[in-house]
Amino acid sequence: MIVGMGTDIVAVERMARLHARFGERLTERLLGPLEVADMPVEAAAGAAFLARRFAAKEATFKALGSGMTNGMRWMDVQVGHDSGGRPQLVLGGRAQQLLRGLGDGVRSWLSISDERRYAMAVVVLERGG
């Protein structure tokens, strides 16, 4: 049974402008340690990376029914990968608490896609099945 679903789309150029303006302050606020290790150095690749991560985090907040409220931080949601390279959510802090509040056996599914101008993500939270 689906217990939560969220989606988000982000303009890569928006992330490029934010990163050019705020630099490391943006990455320190937005990314967790897992993600910082994967961040590309080259500017265009970095902007696309940030857009994908931002979309994944926003989609997760929506799936959890939370948004950036009640103590939620950007770093409470990180994107890692399983052994096959498939993206996985790694939740901590308030995000992990909200997921636990949905009951036992809730799994998360994350899909991320991007093109030159946009990045998008979909998160589905499923119990059982």
UniProtKB/Swiss-Prot annotation:
Q: Could you tell me where this protein is found in the cell?
A: Cytoplasm
The portions of this protein that span the membrane are none
Q: What is its main location?
A: cytoplasm
Q: Check the UniProt entry and state the signal peptide residues, or none.
A: none
- Is this entry keyworded Cytoplasm? yes
Q: Which Pfam families match?
A: ACPS (PF01648)
**Enzyme Commission number(s):** 2.7.8.7
Q: Which GO terms describe its cellular component?
A: cytoplasm
> Which Cys pairs does UniProt list as disulfide-bonded?
none
Q: Which reaction does it catalyse?
A: apo-[ACP] + CoA = holo-[ACP] + adenosine 3',5'-bisphosphate + H(+)
Q: Where does Mg(2+) bind?
A: 8, 58
Mind telling me which Gene3D superfamilies this protein's record contains?
4'-phosphopantetheinyl transferase domain (3.90.470.20)
**Sorted alphabetically, which keywords does the UniProt record give?**
Cytoplasm, Fatty acid biosynthesis, Fatty acid metabolism, Lipid biosynthesis, Lipid metabolism, Magnesium, Metal-binding, Transferase
Q: What does this protein do?
A: Transfers the 4'-phosphopantetheine moiety from coenzyme A to a Ser of acyl-carrier-protein.
Cited NCBIfam families = acpS, pantethn_trn
Designated name of the protein: Holo-[acyl-carrier-protein] synthase
